[in-house]
Curated annotation (Swiss-Prot):
It comes from Cereibacter sphaeroides (strain KD131 / KCTC 12085) (Rhodobacter sphaeroides). The gene is dap. The lineage of its organism: Bacteria, Pseudomonadati, Pseudomonadota, Alphaproteobacteria, Rhodobacterales. The active site is at residues 61, 64. The keyword Protease applies. Substrate binds at residue 480. It is an enzyme of class 3 (hydrolase). Hydrolyzes N-terminal residues in D-amino acid-containing peptides. This is D-aminopeptidase. Keywords: Aminopeptidase, Hydrolase, Protease. Inhibited by beta-lactam compounds such as 6-aminopenicillic acid, 7-aminocephalosporanic acid, benzylpenicillin and ampicillin. Inhibited by p-chloromercuribenzoate.
C-alpha cells in the first residue's frame, strides 16, 4: 500500500484551522517508520511555552490498553483471578463480571466518573486515590448482565489495576516501565495519576473558538483507567514497536488486539482496552482519551501497517482529526448520503429509560443517545447508518440497532413538551443503589436538580421538560470528560401521585430514586 504523502501533508496543515485551539501534536507511522510529526501552538498560552513533539501530554483513556497489556504479560490467564472481583463489589446482588469482562467493558457496571456527579461532586474538586473504592463498593446492581452488552466503564480498569498491583506486589508505574515503556522506547512516558500536577506543566484548555479558552482545573486521581502522560515522540515509538512485533503472536499488542466477543459468541467492538472499528474504509484498533482541557486519539491499521496519533490541549475532536489524517493518507472519500426526510423526532427506550433524539440536516442525521452524538448517513437502501449504529422505523416506533454495543432498542415515540410545572416533582429523593440523594427545586417556571452523597453537595443543574413526565438534567462539566451530558429523568407515579424518579445516562442507566 502506497501512502498519498502530499494529501497527508495537506491534511496535517489543515488541523490547526479545522480544530481550533491553543495547541496540538499529530504524527503518522507507516511500516514502522515515522513519516510525519507535527507540533503547533502552545503548551501554555500565558507563559508562551510552545508545544513541541517532546512535550508530554495526558493520553487519558488510551492508558487502558497499557493496563491490559501489562495484565496479560504478568499474570497471563485472567480467569485465574476472577474470584478477586468480588472483593471490590461487596454489596453486589447479581452475577459478578469476570476479569476479562472488565477489560472488555462488558461488566454492566455503571461508570464511576458519571456516578461522581450523582454523589455530589463538583467538577474541579479533589478526588483522591482513596475516594474511588468506597464509591465502587456501594454498587448493588449493574445496568445489564455481564457479558451480554457493551458499556464504557472506567471503574472496570480501576479494579483491574488494583488486582494487578496486589497480585504482583509491584506498583503500576514500574510495571508499565518494565513491560511496555522500556521495550517500546517510550523514553519519557510515565504514569502521572494526579491531574493537578501535569507532566511538563502543560496546560489544558476548556472553552471554544466562539467563547475563548480558559485553563481547565482538574483535581482527579486516576490509575489503571487513565493517567499516563507521553510525548508525541513516545507515542510514535509505541506505534513503531507495535509494527516491529507484528509477527510475534505472543507480543503484547497482538495479544490485546485479538477480536473480542460476547458470551453469546457475537463479535464485540471492544476488548482489552482497545476499540475495534472501521475508519476511512479500513479496520483499525485504537482508543480515544479525554480529560477536561485535553483530547487524544490513536488508530492502528494492522493490515496497512499504518498508525495515526493526535493529541490536543483543548477539547476539539481528536477522533475526527485522526480520522481525517487516515482518510487523507489512504485516499479515502466518504460516500455522500441522500437528504433524509421524516426521521426527526424523539423517542423513549422503555428498557434503559433513556431518551433518543434524532435531528436532520442536508448531509444526514444526528442521533443523540450515548455520551456523544452519532452521525448517520442515508444509504441507497434508505437505511441511516453510522459507526456501529443503524436506524429503522416500525410504525411510530424507532428501532435502533447498535451493533457496537450488542444492543437493539425499540423506542416509543415521546410527544414534545416544552413547558411543564415542576412544582409537583419538587422535593427530596433517595437512591438505595447509590446511598445518595437528589433534591429538586422549582421556582417561577425554572427547575433545578442538586445531587448529594459521598462526595458532598454538588452544584444545582438545569432541569428541562422534554415529554410527559420526562425531563432532562443537563451536566456539561464534571470531574472526567466528556461529561455525562443529558440525564433522562422519568417521573414515577402511583394513583397519580409522584412516588419516585428513574434517572439515567448511557454511562449509568436505570437508577431509581424514592420520594422521601
Amino acid at each position: 500500500m502506497t501512502l498519498d504523502l502530499d494529501a497527508l501533508d495537506r491534511a496535517l496543515d489543515a488541523l490547526p484551522n479545522l480544530f481550533r485551539g491553543p495547541g496540538g501534536v499529530a504524527g503518522v507511522v507507516k511500516d514502522g517508520q515515522v513519516v510525519a510529526s507535527r507540533a503547533w501552538g502552545y503548551a501554555d498560552l500565558t507563559r508562551r511555552r510552545p508545544m513541541e513533539t517532546a512535550t508530554r501530554l495526558p493520553i487519558c483513556s488510551i492508558s487502558k490498553q497499557f493496563t491490559c497489556g501489562v495484565l496479560l504479560d504478568t499474570l497471563g490467564d485472567t480467569a485465574a483471578y476472577d474470584a478477586r472481583v468480588a472483593e471490590f463489589l461487596p454489596q453486589f446482588e447479581g452475577p459478578l463480571p469476570t476479569l476479562r469482562q472488565l477489560c472488555d467493558n462488558q461488566s454492566g457496571l455503571r461508570d464511576y466518573w458519571a456516578l461522581t456527579v450523582l454523589q455530589g461532586a463538583e467538577a474541579t474538586q479533589t478526588f483522591r486515590r482513596e475516594d474511588a473504592l468506597p464509591l465502587i463498593a456501594r454498587m448493588k446492581t449493574g445496568h445489564f448482565p455481564p457479558g451480554t452488552a457493551y458499556s464504557y466503564c472506567n471503574c472496570n480498569f480501576r479494579i483491574v489495576s488494583e488486582i494487578l498491583e496486589s497480585e504482583t506486589g509491584r506498583a503500576l508505574p514500574d510495571l508499565y516501565a518494565e513491560r511496555i515503556f522500556g521495550p517500546a522506547g517510550m523514553r519519557t512516558a510515565e504514569l502521572t495519576s494526579d491531574t493537578r500536577h501535569p507532566a511538563d506543566e502543560v496546560v489544558g484548555y476548556e472553552g471554544s473558538d466562539a467563547v475563548g479558552f480558559f485553563p481547565a482545573d482538574n483535581g482527579i486521581f486516576w490509575i489503571g483507567d487513565a493517567g499516563i502522560s507521553a510525548s508525541l515522540q513516545d507515542m510514535l515509538a509505541y506505534e513503531s514497536w507495535i509494527d516491529a512485533t507484528r509477527d510475534d503472536e505472543n507480543s503484547i499488542y497482538r495479544r490485546i488486539s485479538v477480536p473480542p466477543a460476547y458470551v453469546c459468541g457475537t463479535p464485540a467492538s471492544y476488548g482489552f482496552g482497545l476499540s475495534h472499528e472501521t475508519v476511512a474504509g479500513v479496520k483499525v484498533t485504537g482508543h480515544g482519551g479525554a480529560l477536561r482541557g485535553f483530547r487524544a486519539q490513536r488508530f492502528h491499521a494492522a493490515d496497512e501497517r499504518l498508525s495515526v496519533m493526535v493529541i490536543f490541549n483543548h477539547e476539539a475532536s481528536a477522533h475526527a482529526a485522526a480520522s481525517s489524517l487516515l482518510a487523507a493518507a489512504l485516499g479515502h472519500e466518504a460516500p455522500k448520503g441522500a437528504r433524509p426526510e421524516g426521521w426527526a423526532g424523539q423517542w423513549l427506550d422503555p428498557e434503559s429509560g433513556l431518551l433518543l433524539r434524532v435531528g436532520e440536516d442536508a448531509e444526514g442525521l444526528t442521533l443523540r443517545f450515548a455520551t456523544g452524538p452519532d452521525r448517520l448517513t442515508l444509504g441507497e437502501d434508505g437505511v441511516p447508518r453510522g459507526a456501529g449504529v443503524s436506524l429503522a422505523r416500525d410504525g411510530a416506533m424507532l428501532v435502533m440497532n447498535r451493533t457496537s454495543d450488542n444492543l437493539t432498542v425499540r423506542a416509543e415515540p415521546l410527544p414534545v413538551v416544552t413547558v411543564a410545572d415542576a412544582g409537583e416533582i419538587a422535593g427530596r429523593y433517595h437512591a438505595r443503589e447509590l446511598e445518595a440523594d437528589l433534591v429538586i427545586e422549582a421556582r417561577d417556571g425554572g427547575a433545578y436538580a442538586g445531587f448529594e452523597g459521598l462526595l458532598g453537595e454538588g452544584p444545582m443543574e438545569r432541569l428541562h421538560p422534554v415529554g410527559p413526565d420526562v425531563w432532562i438534567v443537563t451536566t456539561r462539566r464534571s470531574m472526567d470528560a466528556p461529561a455525562p451530558g443529558d440525564w433522562t429523568l422519568q417521573v414515577r407515579r402511583e394513583g397519580g401521585a409522584v412516588t419516585g424518579l428513574r434517572l439515567g445516562c448511557w454511562l449509568a442507566r436505570r437508577i431509581d430514586y424514592a420520594r422521601v
